[in-house]
């Protein structure tokens, strides 16, 4: 059905009005901007002063969304990089960088990306700010990185030169808020969505949030964006966005097929039926146990749950290994003739200690005590004799081949996983956690916590 010019203009007006109203809600006010700037400058000054006191050759700079003025109000995660000369050894970078970072904060925790950094907490102007203090090498050329984080200052410079004062900062905020409301903002393993830097590049490419959505609504698998036209990356991902400062890198490598598809669908929905609701973060409401039981009964499937204490590693490593374990366990289940419909992983923080959980939904979860074992063709005499020597009669013949019926070792999925889970390829940290103890049960027999309810809300598509 064709849309008249009048209707198109009316729709465009509504879209612009909604976006302008949302911008007013999510743009940091003057007070918030002044606080973030003051705190950032204070930390940088303290770091530089401490570096002199401690005899450390390093200086601090501000990077990320607060440096580029693209953060959403109330979401100011401050990133400060501590720049060391390129000739610094990896050991000195780690030891001196962490010592310097710890010296400016009373409350912090050590985290790990490509190398350790400090996640600090600062009380400032009656609120608490979270700040990442990241040691890196001050490389002169992004093609000569010594660690993955070394390219971030180049990202900073690239975006600031093209975004600052352009008026596009608010368009970036709109995109971030939109993605956040669909649970696909952030490149960490838990989400596998769109990073802040990727959002900035997409707006630089399309010049407005609405223009971006109109293009995204038409995306196909393998969509390729190369702002500088110098890309050398040849991977196979749903979305490829060449890094302007590193032509061999895909900025969108972390974006999963789900996140890619979710964005396309959300873009089409918003453009067709624009509403403020697309920008409203909703408090996640977990499914109750009774709701879950009703839905599960209607589906007619069975759910098996594997639970164990979550390894104490950074979230990205944890979820990467959980997904690896999920794939391996799923293969074990299917090798034993059970049929997996869907599966997923989560971490339940609604317990005394964080629990890692793998969930498997099954179409076939119980099997007969016997199974058919197909042998060689009767005409292959040498192989046939070996087969008959190895197995016990009776020998059946079907379609010209010998067949024997053998006793199935596991007739239900729970007994299989209780006995064979450790044989799976689980990843270093998950394997160690499994060794310390795990629980396998049907979902109806397990503890139904808030965390489980939140997982199934998303699993069933009710988010």
Feature names for model-found ranges:
Residues 71-72, 76, 80-85, 132-166:
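Hydrophobic, small-residue-rich alpha-helical packing segments that form membrane-like cores
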Residues 78-85, 304-313, 357-362:
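Short, hydrophobic beta-strand segments
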Residues 167-353, 365-370:
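Conserved nucleotidyltransferase catalytic core and NTase-mimicking acidic/glycine-rich helix/loop elements
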Residues 94-100, 372-377:
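Short amphipathic alpha-helices in soluble, non-transmembrane regions
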Residues 86-90, 107-108, 162-166, 187:
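Short, polar/flexible loop-turn hinges at active-site or ligand-entry regions and domain interfaces
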Residues 346-463:
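Extended, charged low-complexity segments
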Residues 47, 95-146, 333, 339-358:
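Conserved catalytic core of two-metal-ion nucleotidyltransferases
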Residues 1-75, 87-91, 121, 136-139, ...:
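N-terminal regions immediately upstream of nucleotidyltransferase
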């Amino acid at each position: 059905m064709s849309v008249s010019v009048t209707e198109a203009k009316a729709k465009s007006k509504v879209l612009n009005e909604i976006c302008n109203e949302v911008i007013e809600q999510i743009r940091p006010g003057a007070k918030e901007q002044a606080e973030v700037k003051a705190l950032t400058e204070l930390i940088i000054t303290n770091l530089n002063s401490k570096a002199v006191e401690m005899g450390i050759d390093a200086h601090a700079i501000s990077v990320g969304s607060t440096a580029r003025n693209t953060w959403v109000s109330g979401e100011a995660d401050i990133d400060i990089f501590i720049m060391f000369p390129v000739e610094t050894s990896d050991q000195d970078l780690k030891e001196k960088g962490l010592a310097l970072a710890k010296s400016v904060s009373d409350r912090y925790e050590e985290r790990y990306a490509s190398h350790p950094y400090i996640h600090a907490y600062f009380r400032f102007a009656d609120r608490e700010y979270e700040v990442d203090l990241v040691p890196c090498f001050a490389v002169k050329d992004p093609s000569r990185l010594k660690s993955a984080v070394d390219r971030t200052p180049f990202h900073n410079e690239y975006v600031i030169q093209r975004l600052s004062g352009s008026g596009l900062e608010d368009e970036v905020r709109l995109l971030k808020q939109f993605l956040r409301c669909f649970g696909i903002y952030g490149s960490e393993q838990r989400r596998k969505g769109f990073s802040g830097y990727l959002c900035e590049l997409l707006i630089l490419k399309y010049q407005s949030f609405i223009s971006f959505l109109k293009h995204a609504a038409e995306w196909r698998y393998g969509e390729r964006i190369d702002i500088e036209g110098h890309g050398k990356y040849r991977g196979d991902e749903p979305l490829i966005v060449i890094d302007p400062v590193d032509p061999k890198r895909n900025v969108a490598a972390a974006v999963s097929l789900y996140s890619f598809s979710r964005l396309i669908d959300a873009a089409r929905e918003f453009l067709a039926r624009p509403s403020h609701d697309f920008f409203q973060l909703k408090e996640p409401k977990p499914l109750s146990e009774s709701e879950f039981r009703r839905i599960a009964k209607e589906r007619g499937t069975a759910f098996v749950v594997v639970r164990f204490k979550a390894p104490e590693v950074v979230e990205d490593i944890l979820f990467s290994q959980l997904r690896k374990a999920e794939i391996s366990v799923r293969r074990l289940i299917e090798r034993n003739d059970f049929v997996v419909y869907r599966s997923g992983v989560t971490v339940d923080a609604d317990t005394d200690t964080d629990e890692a959980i793998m969930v498997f939904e099954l179409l076939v979860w119980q099997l007969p005590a016997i199974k058919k074992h197909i042998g060689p063709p009767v005409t292959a005499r040498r192989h046939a004799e070996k087969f008959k020597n190895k197995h016990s009669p009776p020998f059946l013949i079907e379609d010209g081949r010998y067949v024997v019926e053998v006793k199935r070792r596991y007739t239900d999925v729970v007994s299989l996983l209780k006995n064979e889970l450790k044989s799976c390829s689980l990843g270093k940290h998950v394997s160690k956690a499994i060794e310390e103890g795990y629980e396998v049960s049907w979902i109806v027999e397990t503890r139904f916590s808030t965390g489980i309810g939140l997982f199934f809300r998303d699993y069933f598509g009710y988010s």
